[in-house]
């Protein structure tokens, strides 16, 4: 595999949207004093259901962001969206002391989420969602907890297969519940 020259861009770069979530200045104590560096947390998505996050460390901010972006592209996941705009069902995710609750929302609700979660939903292409962060407000824990929840998102067809029932029956039950709420 040939190495890419510095400054060359991958052809797929145009289809991804990236958001810088957090930059942290870190220090390493050495004999001559402190040596400073930077750690960056970046979220990358195609706004069509694929999203990933990455962590990069370097002596300079742009290099840390570049490394984080590359890591995010390597670790992307696919999240099935209902009508291309919201979740199929409510979710809960955990990581460390961080806990997030994600709820599907009706059309026109928008993204109601704080901090790092908003960046994830925007890059994912989600338009309507309500999210609540409980516990740790550390951006790393919030991002990982959100990804934990999104990994457990299942399409209703997969749920129907697991339960051994027809998709149309599951869909009819859901519509009955929606009509009862309305």
UniProtKB/Swiss-Prot annotation:
Which family, according to UniProt?
Belongs to the universal ribosomal protein uS5 family.
InterPro entries membership:
Ribosomal_Su5_D2-typ_SF (IPR020568), Ribosomal_uS5 (IPR000851), Ribosomal_uS5_bac-type (IPR005712), Ribosomal_uS5_C (IPR005324), Ribosomal_uS5_N (IPR013810), Ribosomal_uS5_N_CS (IPR018192), Ribsml_uS5_D2-typ_fold_subgr (IPR014721)
Tell me the keywords, alphabetical order: Ribonucleoprotein, Ribosomal protein, RNA-binding, rRNA-binding
Q: Which GO terms describe its molecular function?
A: rRNA binding; structural constituent of ribosome
**SUPFAM superfamilies membership:** dsRNA-binding domain-like (SSF54768), Ribosomal protein S5 domain 2-like (SSF54211)
The S5 DRBM domain, residue ranges: 16-79
Q: Gene encoding this polypeptide?
A: rpsE
Instruction: Spell out the PROSITE patterns in the cross-references.
Output: RIBOSOMAL_S5 (PS00585), S5_DSRBD (PS50881)
Complex formation? Part of the 30S ribosomal subunit. Contacts proteins S4 and S8.
Its biological purpose is as follows: With S4 and S12 plays an important role in translational accuracy. Located at the back of the 30S subunit body where it stabilizes the conformation of the head with respect to the body.
Tell me what this protein is called.
Answer: Small ribosomal subunit protein uS5
**What Gene Ontology cellular component terms go with this record?**
small ribosomal subunit
